[in-house]
């Protein structure tokens, strides 16, 4: 059997919007930065990042511009895959701005809908945006699709949250990596 489509789509968000999200991450004093978690909790062997969970109701203009851009991309995805919107979709949980130091990544193959967390069980689609360019490594590998994304500032990808899209990070040996991960869930 041959796979017909990957259901992975993408586009580019303006560099100024990425700079705004990165500035928010670096200057926000009311949201905490914590060790990145997996579905099993904090495990620095699997995921080495410093994450900031950002509620979607935050009205900071830097975040609003980013979420508006992401929602515009969702509309294009739905045009391409109309059955992806069989039910209402919404960003129900805080999204993550993540910082990986050189050599760090989320190395374990994983999906975005896993574990016993009831919130994650409603996830339908995943967004990921690279906030900075990386010269070497730092991409994302999709196991079943044999696809490796190169990290370019503003590159924003969307894909289904389930087992069909197992993926993992690739370390950037010399540079910091910043990404945003957003989950569209059944509302």
Per-range role (PLM):
Residues 1-156, 164-187:
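Fe(II)/2-oxoglutarate oxygenase catalytic core
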């Amino acid at each position: 059997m041959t796979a017909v489509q990957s259901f992975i789509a993408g586009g580019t968000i303006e560099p100024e919007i990425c700079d705004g999200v990165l500035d928010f991450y670096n200057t926000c004093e009311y949201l905490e930065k914590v060790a990145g978690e997996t579905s099993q909790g904090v495990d620095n062997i699997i995921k080495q990042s410093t994450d900031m969970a950002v509620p979607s109701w935050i009205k900071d203009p830097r975040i609003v511009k980013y979420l508006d851009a992401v929602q515009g991309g969702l509309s294009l995805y739905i045009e391409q895959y109309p059955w992806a919107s069989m039910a209402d979709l919404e960003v129900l949980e805080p999204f993550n701005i993540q910082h990986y130091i050189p050599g760090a990544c989320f190395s374990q193959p994983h999906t975005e809908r896993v574990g016993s967390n009831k919130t994650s069980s409603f996830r339908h689609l995943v967004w990921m945006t690279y906030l900075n360019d990386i010269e070497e490594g730092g991409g994302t590998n999709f196991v079943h699709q044999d696809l490796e994304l190169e990290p370019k500032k503003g590159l924003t990808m969307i894909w289904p949250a389930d087992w069909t899209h197992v993926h993992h990070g690739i370390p950037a040996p010399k540079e910091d990596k910043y990404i945003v991960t957003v989950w569209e869930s059944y509302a």
